[in-house]
């Protein structure tokens, strides 16, 4: 769960902890 401003991959999914991308669509950084 990160700031939406960092969203760039998927449907507006935010960047967050490693593994978050698995549940959303962003690259969880």
From Swiss-Prot:
Keywords: Cuticle
Task of the protein: Component of the cuticle of migratory locust which contains more than 100 different structural proteins.
Superkingdom per UniProt: Eukaryota
GO MF annotation list: structural constituent of cuticle
Name the record gives this protein: Cuticle protein 36
């Amino acid at each position: 769960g990160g700031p939406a401003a960092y969203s760039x991959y998927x449907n507006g999914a935010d960047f967050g902890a490693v593994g978050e991308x698995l549940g959303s669509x962003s690259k969880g950084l």
